[in-house]
From Swiss-Prot:
Part of the 50S ribosomal subunit. Forms a cluster with proteins L14 and L19. The gene is rplC. Keywords: Ribonucleoprotein, Ribosomal protein, RNA-binding, rRNA-binding. GO terms for biological process: translation. This is Large ribosomal subunit protein uL3.
Amino acid sequence: MSLGILGRKLGMTQIFDEEGRAIPVTVVEAGPCPVTQVKSEATDGYTAVQLGFGTAREKVLTRPEVGHCKKAGLEAPVRHLREFRLPDSSQYTPGQQITVDLFAAGQLVDVVGTSIGKGFAGGQKRHHFGRGPMAHGSKNHRAPGSIGAGTTPGRVFPGKRMPGRMGNERVTVRKLTVVRVIPERNVILIQGGLPGVEGGLLMISPAKSVGRAKG
């Protein structure tokens, strides 16, 4: 895995390329992200770089969290902490700033976010189940149907697709194209939609697998 950056989803808009085609993009405020911890094989058993994003008042954080930020030499505590696994983390030091200069236009990236919560949803909306007959005599219109056999096994298997809370899950969208990078404003424009609400936290990293871009 390569080092990425943390950002905040601002919303969607569209821009026009040189040929006049409209490109839908998501605007992300990315970084600057201070390095809060560098993990190594000797001390942690694996190599990774932990980044921080956003600011928070000390009163809303625990004392260990405040001490963790002060140990990294940060002027103010950060609200979010995320780490990126790397094969070699020796080139990074606590307090170092990671900015959107990490990316370039045309690059493919993977974006991780938390999907929008939809609340309690039924089988058709949550799992795309088919409906039952809509005839006058039918009583099975949107019901999920059988959820298992009888005495054997005598239980519902774990993971059975059923109605329940929908959304609010970690979602990864792969191989999206960076359309534009604006370093002076800490903004990156990524083609297409990204998971989560406006203001939601995103993790942006170089694409693990390269090939034809989505969109």
